[in-house]
Amino acid sequence: MRAILITLFLILSVVVAEEAEDAAIVETIDPAKEAGISVATNPAKDHGIGGTGEINDLAEDAGVGISKAIYQTLSGQPEAYESPRFKRFVTHCSSHVAETCSDPMHYEGGIRNPTGLSHCIFDSMKACLANHKASLYDSARSKTLNLKPTKVEYLPVIIQTVKFQTVWKTCSQVSAQSCLSDSDVDASTLGACLLPSFNQCVYPTPPPPPPPPPPDETRR
């Protein structure tokens, strides 16, 4: 089990490093910067992890925190971007995105094709989150409690930032593709489609609970 978790940690470290090219969103929503962490940082290197023996030693001793962080993240722990606090930022900014990207005067007229529209959705959401100083981490609570998270404790936040980036990019493309049915779509129609489409993609409505089982006829 430990070997699997350590392997997942190393894979996620590579994914985090590859997402460094999108550093703008990290500055917008990732509190890791407050703790001096870059998305391009290799957490394994920071903690002195080298060969297999060192990895095993770390997992056995100080590495328990890393393994636990990954285990909690991958075993159903509520994702940071799904927290009610951050969800309010995203849903609020979705209205701004729909208004901006449905106006043909915005984004140099490039929103009349799915690629241009998806870029507009992504960039407008990034700008709105930055304006509202949205963060995946409640820094106000940390200051109130006088907390100073370590790099290991920040690992789940970095992972969730990458996950949110992936969802955000995908939903920008999905909404653009589904709402821009043709180049002559009306601006009001486009805006009315973008808002629910993007929100539903990022925060899908959970399926209804299954119906109760029928009564057992044999007990009558």
Curated annotation (Swiss-Prot):
Superkingdom of the organism of origin: Eukaryota
GO biological process: nodulation
Transmembrane segments: none
Keyword Nucleus appears in the UniProt entry: no
Tissue: Expressed only in infected cells of the nodule.
Keyword annotations: Nodulation, Signal
Pfam family, one: Nodulin
Range of residues in the leader sequence: 1-17
Family, similarity comment: Belongs to the nodulin 20 family.
Protein name, UniProt field: Nodulin-30
Species classification: Eukaryota, Viridiplantae, Streptophyta, Embryophyta, Tracheophyta
